[in-house]
Amino acid sequence: EPEFISLSRDHVHVTETEHLVYQVPDHRRERALVRLLEVENPASAIIFCNTKAHVHFVSVVLQRFGYDADELSADLAQNERERVLQRVREGNLRYLVATDVAGRGIDIPDLSHVIQYELPEDPESYVHRAGRTGRAGATGIAITLISGITDKLALDRIAKRFGIAFEERALPTDADLEAVVAERVTALLEARLRERDSIQHERSRRFAALA
């Protein structure tokens, strides 16, 4: 069931959010992230990392896989930061990769997903991150990648402190990915066929009027 969480001190609220957890090998986090993005296919997402180096790495990986992704960290020059923020304001950026500090104060309307590439060092930051999605009665999804017993214990402490029911899931398999891709290709082809039929119908109607 969706969790109802609020952190009123900073006006952060999570109205209805699913909290999903994926256990992944630490050295394959980026591959796991790409796999999840393929299956979840969010319209927009913030991907949180703990360090500026990880923000840059994840952003580059996503771009190389063809995703519309950009980064936001303290290392960015002011003009680059403004460029990224402008894309966010205009709704022209699909995936924003950011640190907690750089992402503070950024509001993306109708954000469906928050993805935590790694658990935050401060447990309270989890609620701040997850609070970016599931607003105004909408259902949001907060995904967290964890690796090893240390992460698992940290997650348990977050669950206990904030009363969050995490749902642990297995990563999508190759078969899952193939099924998702096939479904999207089929939907695309059907949409194009409907569009073609609609155009042909309109042409027939016009020619009939000329006869």
Where are these regions (language model features)?
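Conserved helicase RecA-like core
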Residues: 1-209
